[in-house]
Curated annotation (Swiss-Prot):
GO CC annotation, single: plasma membrane
Source organism of the structure: Rhizobium meliloti (strain 1021) (Ensifer meliloti)
Signal peptide range in chain numbering: none
Pfam families: PHO4
Single GO MF annotation: symporter activity
Alphabetical UniProt keywords: Cell membrane, Membrane, Phosphate transport, Symport, Transmembrane, Transmembrane helix, Transport
Origin organism lineage: Bacteria, Pseudomonadati, Pseudomonadota, Alphaproteobacteria, Hyphomicrobiales
Job of this protein: Low-affinity inorganic phosphate transporter.
Bilayer topology: Multi-pass membrane protein
Reactions the enzyme catalyzes: phosphate(in) + H(+)(in) = phosphate(out) + H(+)(out)
Name of the protein in its database record: Probable low-affinity inorganic phosphate transporter
Family classification: Belongs to the inorganic phosphate transporter (PiT) (TC 2.A.20) family. Pit subfamily.
């Protein structure tokens, strides 16, 4: 392919992608620290530094399978143009900002995938969609909250049985320490899965402009800059969403926080190794609901959980609609 986009414009579009990655950290990093903050194991200002560090080093632990899926497995890379990438990013960024302002824990992953699909449909219609990859991703998006729910619920039941003879103080003290481990694992999972989505976007843009040759791959500088952007976003993560995730859905103690984070982390690790982009937001939401339901069903604020599900359902079509409109606008200007 010929490199048809002026270099300054290419740099500008990459900057937009990195801004999305920063917003992803800002918006979704709350998921990494919500439970450890709500259980008062760490203060918010210390928790964000903790999460940012593990978000940044996540590339050391995972392959780049999620980036490859985003780059080649959602829409046909052959139809990708700068307008498609711009529209996809603007759809995702716009929706992320709207939900962040209102403190709604919607998914940056859903928004980006919806943005890609909307831009692809606007350009060439249904032929632009890689249906096998999209359906696999959509299936994982639907299943991941349920998997997080089940794993966290099982962990609570197992841990409660193992520590049944311990005093509440001893259990609390033990899991205050163990929550550092579980929060670290969840932050690794978040950085490993979410940063790779932006890597895939930047890499397919470079590929479409001929900068990668005939083979799609993710350059190392893209890996580092994306991990840095999501880590910086984590440092500025929003307390609005931390409060919703960590205390409004259900009250948590350190043992429950450990189980929620561990259940969510296992889900994210498996998805990342399989190359499936999933929602870190809804994975931890499912896990938090699971630990609340293990205590008693009424411990979960089901009304708020229902609002989160509504946001989960409308995110992809909303981002797709915004991105399609942005594509048509960008195409007119071009």
């Amino acid at each position: 392919m010929d490199a048809t986009l002026a270099f300054p414009l290419l740099v500008g579009l990459i900057a937009v992608a990195l801004f999305f990655d920063f917003l992803n950290g800002l918006h979704d990093a709350a998921n990494s620290i919500a439970t450890i903050v709500s259980t008062r194991v760490l203060r918010p200002q210390y928790a964000v530094f903790w999460a940012a560090f593990f978000n940044f080093i996540a590339f050391l632990f995972f392959g780049l399978h999620v980036a490859e899926t985003l780059g080649t497995g959602i829409i046909d890379p052959g139809i990708v143009t700068p307008q498609v990438i711009f529209a996809a990013l603007m759809g995702a960024i716009t929706w992320n900002i709207v939900t962040w302002v209102f403190g709604i824990p919607s998914s940056s992953s859903h928004a980006l995938i919806g943005g890609l699909v909307g831009a692809g449909l606007a350009k060439t219609g249904f032929s632009s969609i890689v249906w096998q990859g999209l359906l696999k991703t959509a299936g994982a998006i639907v299943m991941s909250p349920g998997i997080g729910f089940v794993l966290a619920l099982l962990l609570v039941l197992i841990v409660s049985w193992l520590f049944v003879r311990q005093t509440p103080f001893a259990v609390d003290s033990t899991f205050r320490v163990l929550q550092f481990v579980s929060a670290s694992l969840y932050s690794l999972g978040h950085g490993g899965n979410d940063a790779q989505k932006t890597m895939g976007i930047i890499a397919v843009l470079l590929f479409s402009q001929g900068y990668l040759g005939s083979e799609f791959y993710v350059p190392f500088w893209v890996v580092i800059t994306c991990q840095a952007a999501i880590a910086l976003g984590t440092l500025f993560g929003g307390w609005r969403i931390v409060h919703t995730m960590g205390s409004k859905i259900t009250k948590l103690n350190p043992m429950q926080g450990f189980c929620a984070e561990t259940g969510g982390a296992i889900t994210l690790f498996a998805a990342t190794w399989l190359g499936i982009p999933v929602s870190t937001t809804h994975t931890i939401t499912g896990a938090i609901i699971g630990v609340g339901a293990a205590r008693r069903v009424s411990a979960v604020r089901w009304g708020l959980a229902g609002n989160i599900v509504v946001a989960w359902v409308i995110t992809m079509p909303a981002a797709a609609l915004i991105s399609a409109l942005c594509y048509f606008a960008a195409d007119l200007v071009a």
